[in-house]
Curated annotation (Swiss-Prot):
The gene is dnaG. Its cofactor is Mg(2+). Keywords: DNA replication, DNA-directed RNA polymerase, Exosome, Magnesium, Metal-binding, Nucleotidyltransferase, Primosome, Transcription, Transferase. This is DNA primase DnaG. SUPFAM superfamilies: DNA primase core. InterPro entries: DnaG_primase, Primase_DnaG_arc, TOPRIM_DnaG/twinkle, TOPRIM_dom. It comes from Saccharolobus islandicus (strain L.S.2.15 / Lassen #1). Belongs to the archaeal DnaG primase family.
Length: 402
């Protein structure tokens, strides 16, 4: 069928469906000859079965009619007008009125188009092959076995830190794991040292032909380099992750690019000094009003359940996170890379606390504020320009050392 003729009707009395159908056939018969006789058209398959829905209300009958039509547009319009001319059903006066003529093919086409859009959308959302994830999965079986603990401080390190003439120094265990994943085995971590670099790193650096400090692309990386130099660690070259990125999250290509762009220490320090001088001159040249700086660190007092404390001790180096509800009940364990999409999928107020082995970033803080998350506990705090008032943040060091 091409069209559905839809009409509504009212009858000044109580009638049955058969009465309505009989009135339609009877009062349209021979109006335009046999060619437009409804029974003949039904027999030839040009019209479908008449569908009647009827209701009684206050001694009257009302309802809707659908007449499927396989005629052309002009003939279908004529049939609709013929049915509208029916003014009696049985002994009662009646009124038939056209609601619409629905183009079934157009509606079917709309449904097909909408379905095609849905198929395309779900197809686009399907996980495409991510080479990094493939490498991660393949290497996960060996990465834990390859990582070693070096020196009396039990520092995370690759298996070749002793025998390789070159050494890569990174900040934390997660950085070591990521470099091992891509085949860099001459790597050792200072474990986020901010005041005293382990003596093992100092002595090991002096035994190596070339030492590379490979650090995060944020202020934290600047601080680690400063501590390395102030503790007399031998540094020959400096490599940095892209601005705002962490070594632990880089792909193999990004690691290779960062290391290929490393600079000799003297050249790097000169570049930094020139940049600082340029900034200083620019600031002096401008007359600016004093700016009131907000305190960036707030005192957070909270009692953590024992099971959460135990979980925090296990997380470093796993690149995993845990989501808790308002009562510190476990909601889900996730990979660090999946935390933001997971949070976006949850309803507001569902997650109250996040504990994860990763960097607390501005993007994560903004999303947490939007989702009414109370607290984030992470491995480190990245470059944060604006701290939401409704989200407390702590690091593993804050928890474990307290």
């Amino acid at each position: 069928m091409k069209y559905d003729i839809k009409l509504r009707f009212e009858v000044e009395g109580i009638v049955e469906k058969t009465d309505v159908i009989g009135a339609i056939f009877g009062q349209t018969e021979n109006l335009f000859g046999d060619e437009f006789d409804l029974r003949e058209l039904q027999d030839k398959g040009r019209l479908g079965r008449i569908i009647v829905e009827i209701r009684t209300k206050g001694g009257k009958s009302e309802g809707e009619i659908i007449i499927p039509s396989n005629l052309d547009r002009i003939e279908t319009a004529l049939i609709a007008a013929m049915v509208e001319s029916v003014d009696k059903v049985g002994p009662y006066n009646s009124k038939f009125e056209l609601i619409e003529i629905e183009d079934i093919r157009a509606e079917k086409l709309k449904k097909i188009i909408e379905r095609a859009k849905g198929i395309l959308s779900s197809w686009s959302k399907e996980k495409s092959l991510d080479i990094k994830e493939v490498i991660n999965e393949i290497s996960s079986a060996v990465k834990v076995g390859e990582i070693t603990e070096y020196g009396p401080e039990r520092l995370p390190a690759g298996p070749d830190v002793d025998k390789d003439p070159n050494l890569i120094i990174v900040e934390g265990r997660a950085d070591v794991i990521n470099l091992l994943r891509y085949g860099y085995k001459n790597v050792i971590a200072v474990e986020g040292a901010t005041s005293r670099i382990p003596e093992t790193v100092v002595s090991l650096s002096k035994m190596k032909k070339t030492v590379i400090a490979f650090l995060d692309g944020d202020h934290g990386g600047d601080l680690i380099l400063k501590e390395l130099l102030s503790n007399n660690v031998k540094i020959d070259f400096v490599a940095r992750a892209p601005v705002g990125r962490e070594v632990e999250e880089l792909t193999g290509k990004e690691i290779a690019k960062a290391l290929s762009n490393m600079m000799p220490l003297t050249q790097y320090l000169k570049k930094i000094q020139e940049a600082e001088q340029a900034i200083a001159k620019n600031v002096i040249a401008k007359e600016e009003k004093p700016i009131q700086l907000e305190a960036t660190q707030q005192l957070v007092q909270i009692t953590l359940p024992q099971n959460v404390l135990e979980e925090i001790k296990k997380l470093p180096g796993t690149l995993e996170g845990v989501l808790y509800d308002n009562n510190w009940n476990l909601i889900e364990k996730v990979q660090v890379r999946d935390i933001i999409p997971k949070l976006e999928a949850y309803e507001d107020n569902k997650v109250a606390y996040i504990v994860f082995d990763g960097v607390i970033t501005q993007r994560l803080l903004d999303l947490a504020s939007q989702k009414n998350i109370k607290m984030i506990i992470g491995a480190r705090i990245g470059g944060i320009n604006k701290r939401p008032q409704n989200v407390d943040i702590l690091t593993f060091t804050d928890i474990i050392s307290s």
